[in-house]
Amino acid sequence: MAVVIRRASLEDLPAIIKIQHSAFEIESRLYGGRPIPPMWETVDDVAADWPSTLVLVAEVDGQIVGSVRGRLDGDTCHVGRLSVHPEHQGRGVGTQLMLAVEEAFPQARRFELFTGHLSERNLRLYGRIGYVEFRREPVGDGVWLVYMQKDGTTASASSA
């Protein structure tokens, strides 16, 4: 399975949102099926952030199967909305997207992201590529967000 990572275009947004909704719907089951923000995000929401956010997509056989976003704030790149179509999860697509977003921000001294405390697959993936937990915040109903970071100089070296 050859995966091609490229910069997204505005025309890709409907496919990106569809995959994001299906991926995060599965994620929401870990938290009792409660809706989580990525599930109600719209094409217009993503388009509004377009000028300040890099969106990358992963394609297999010309079909979008995943995406990730990165936004530089000072010397920190905030990584978010890593989404892989359920049929393509567990095949390295998420890892490739994460490494590609890091590579796209060589000026970043730090990468930061968050995920839910019950999202073991996410936590394992991020840990495997060098992210470490630095904070947990409660968001209600026993759910915690786990904030993770990675040194930008390490990111450049690991994606080489």
Spans of features found by a protein language model:
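Conserved GNAT acetyl-CoA-binding A-motif
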Residues: 98, 104-117
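A short beta-loop-alpha structural element at the N-terminal edge
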Residues: 4-18
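Conserved GNAT-fold acetyl-CoA-binding loop/helix
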Residues: 17-46
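A short helix-loop-beta-strand connector motif used in the catalytic cores of GNAT acetyltransferases and
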Residues: 44-57, 78
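Conserved beta-strand in the GNAT
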Residues: 57, 63-71, 78-83
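Conserved acetyl-CoA-binding loop-helix of GNAT-fold acetyltransferases
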Residues: 84, 90-103, 124, 128
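Conserved catalytic-core motifs of GNAT/GCN5-like acyltransferases
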Residues: 112-116, 123, 127-147
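A short, internal acetyl-CoA/4′-phosphopantetheine-binding micro-motif in the GNAT/acyltransferase core
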Residues: 82-89, 115-117
